[in-house]
Amino acid sequence: MDIIKGNLDGISKPASNSRIRPGSRSSNASLEVLSTEPGSFKVDTASNLNSGKEDHSESSNTENRRTSNDDKQESCSEKIKLAEEGSDEDLDLVQHQIISECSDEPKLKELDSQLQDAIQKMKKLDKILAKKQRREKEIKKQGLEMRIKLWEEIKSAKYSEAWQSKEEMENTKKFLSLTAVSEETVGPSHEEEDTFSSVFHTQIPPEEYEMQMQKLNKDFTCDVERNESLIKSGKKPFSNTEKIELRGKHNQDFIKRNIELAKESRNPVVMVDREKKRLVELLKDLDEKDSGLSSSEGDQSGWVVPVKGYELAVTQHQQLAEIDIKLQELSAASPTISSFSPRLENRNNQKPDRDGERNMEVTPGEKILRNTKEQRDLHNRLREIDEKLKMMKENVLESTSCLSEEQLKCLLDECILKQKSIIKLSSERKKEDIEDVTPVFPQLSRSIISKLLNESETKVQKTEVEDADMLESEECEASKGYYLTKALTGHNMSEALVTEAENMKCLQFSKDVIISDTKDYFMSKTLGIGRLKRPSFLDDPLYGISVSLSSEDQHLKLSSPENTIADEQETKDAAEECKEP
């Protein structure tokens, strides 16, 4: 930017973009040369008008369009007049400006349409916001009315002193002290007014928003009229911008606020210094209220002290002591009766106590204490009963102590020895027929004696049978060998058959009888096994006697295990009868 010193008295037109020429009228004056800005005057006026249009209605927008077109025509005519008075160079500049302004007109129209659409959207959103704020306001009023009704009902309610407790009284007082402030604020005089004040200075109430919009529209129309008069007179039309700047201080406050908020962007709750001060004031009021409540409660809340709880009266202590003494006496006399007696006595003692308690006034804390006391009593009774049952079991076990395994074995051995001695004595009696014999051992019952005698007889019979079996078996073996040799004398035998017979039956054959013939070998083998129909030696009378003896041996072998089982049962019965005396 070039600055030339000189006088500016002769200048009566806006600054141009041309430099000084020695042949012009204004050659003796100095001018300030600036950078080229085509249509600067038009842009300034358009920006001022657009800033005012944001708060104007649709009807005023149409009027502004007409006035703006008139202003353009008038400005063009004025510029032409000024150019005629000036030099030829000024004429060229004015023509250039007029052409640029005419070319910018469609662009400005597009901007106007976009701004109008944005303004309409903002108005719709403002209406929605205003409706929601009104709804919220109505809900808050309804809540206050409900609180006032509740407060009045609590005041009007008259509780009977019989069942009202201290806790309920204190709670009602606290509730009334909290709701008293809200009741005072809302009344018949305050119903029409706005009960809610804005927390921060930047908040605009919804009712004032419409009034403010109407005022802005009126101011905008007045400013447009003044601008028209200024343009006609040829003066500078910057008064509108100055007024808009005065009205835009509120917007500048928002800019400052945004700058302050940007500084504290790291904090979780972003607030301005003014908002912080306002919060501190509000919190102070709350702290004062809390301190007042705590001081008022401190005087009246002396009853909230930790106490032991339910305490028995002196008469109840005496009754319990008497019951304990009776229980001890009964337990010493008869342990079985003592386990049932405490229940009956406690039931009988509880009946008059319960009747007396019903007549007394019931408070909320006493019910819980009674229930806990009853539960304790039941637990204590059950413990006492369990202990007594354990004692009874221990006494029974001590009285009837069980025998060990060693003791039982010793007793069984003694019984067996006694039985053996009895058997010997019985056998001696039979042989010698002695009648008068003094018993060395303790006397036994007749049944046991008869059993023992039967056992001795069976044993004797067994021994005799075994001896007879041994003799018969020896005779049978001799006879079998004899008959086999007799059967094979008249037949030819091979060497293999002879060796088998010698190995199995220990028989000896003469070498003359042995014949090495394969046919005779197989025939003699079948005869040795005994698969012929009926040999001649079976007709011998001695063969039948040997068969009968072998069948009797088998019968005795089968009956022997049954006799042993019976003998064992008889010994057990004798041992049990020995224990009984």
Swiss-Prot record:
The keyword Phosphoprotein applies. Residues 105-153 form a coiled coil. The modification Phosphoserine is found at S87. Residues 14-30 have a biased composition (Polar residues). Residues 52-77, 344-360, 569-581 have a biased composition (Basic and acidic residues). The gene is FSIP1. Belongs to the FSIP1 family. This is Fibrous sheath-interacting protein 1. Residues 1-77, 338-365, 555-581 are annotated as: Disordered. Keywords: Coiled coil, Phosphoprotein. Disulfide bonds: none annotated. Signal peptide: none annotated.
